[in-house]
């Protein structure tokens, strides 16, 4: 039996079809034949090694996406990235609104906004710690 004839019977890329016990079809295949042997000279070398991981890689045939599909995918990815960046920019703007202004009229960069937020949070934390210490002193002395 030639390789072309063999391919007609066995579906591509399914190593489970190499073993007679795993075939669920009523179709007669060379694998179901009583005369079939893995040592047969007509049996392809790529399948006679037991169907390891290398066989799966060889069997996979990826169809190259069409230029139209690639353009559509790129366009969709660009749109998702635009939305993500827009959301991030809105979040930066909202953060700038709650930070105290240092230079009126100058918009802080993203990096400056994050630095300013960090310093502002540290100052607020120190104020809270100082207030709690003052409360403790008042309660002990009072």
From Swiss-Prot:
Swiss-Prot/TrEMBL keywords: Developmental protein, Differentiation, DNA-binding, Neurogenesis, Nucleus
Gene3D superfamilies reported for this sequence: Helix-loop-helix DNA-binding domain (4.10.280.10)
Region (Disordered): 30-66
One Gene Ontology cellular component annotation held by this UniProt entry: nucleus
Keyword flag Nucleus: yes
Composition bias type Polar residues, residue spans: 30-48
Pfam families xrefs: HLH (PF00010)
GO annotation (BP), single: embryo development ending in birth or egg hatching
Deletion consequences: Knockout results in ectopic AMsh glial cells and also ectopic amphid socket (AMso) cells, another type of glia, from a different cell lineage. Some animals are missing dorsal, but not ventral, CEPsh glial cells. Mean number of ectopic AMsh glial cells increases on cnd-1 or ngn-1 mutant backgrounds.
Domain bHLH as annotated: residue spans: 72-124
Keyword DNA-binding: yes
Localization in the cell: Nucleus
Quaternary structure note: Forms a heterodimer with hlh-2.
PANTHER family associated with the record: BASIC HELIX-LOOP-HELIX PROTEIN NEUROGENIN-RELATED, TRANSCRIPTION FACTOR ATOH7
Biological role stated in the UniProt entry: Probable transcription factor which binds the E box motif 5'-CA[TC][AG]TG-3'. Essential for the specification of the neuroblast cell fate in the development of peripheral sense organs. Its role in the generation of sensory neurons may be through positively regulating the expression of the zinc finger protein ztf-11 during postdeirid neurogenesis. Required for specification of cell fate, acting in concert with lin-32, in the development of the male-specific genital sensilla (simple sense organs) known as rays.
Protein name: Protein lin-32
Upper lineage: Eukaryota, Metazoa, Ecdysozoa, Nematoda, Chromadorea
Designated gene of the protein: lin-32
């Amino acid at each position: 039996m030639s390789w072309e004839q063999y391919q007609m019977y066995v579906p591509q890329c399914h190593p489970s079809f190499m073993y007679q016990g795993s075939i669920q079809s009523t179709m007669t295949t060379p694998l179901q034949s009583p005369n079939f042997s893995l040592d047969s000279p007509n049996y392809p070398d790529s399948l006679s090694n037991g169907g390891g991981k290398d066989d799966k890689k060889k069997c996979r045939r990826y169809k190259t996406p069409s230029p139209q599909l690639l353009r559509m995918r790129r366009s969709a990815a660009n749109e998702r990235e635009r939305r993500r960046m827009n959301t991030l920019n809105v979040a930066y703007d909202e953060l700038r609104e709650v930070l105290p202004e240092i230079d009126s009229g100058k918009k802080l960069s993203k990096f400056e906004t994050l630095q300013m937020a960090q310093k502002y949070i540290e100052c607020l934390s120190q104020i809270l710690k100082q207030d709690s210490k003052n409360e403790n002193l008042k309660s002990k002395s009072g």
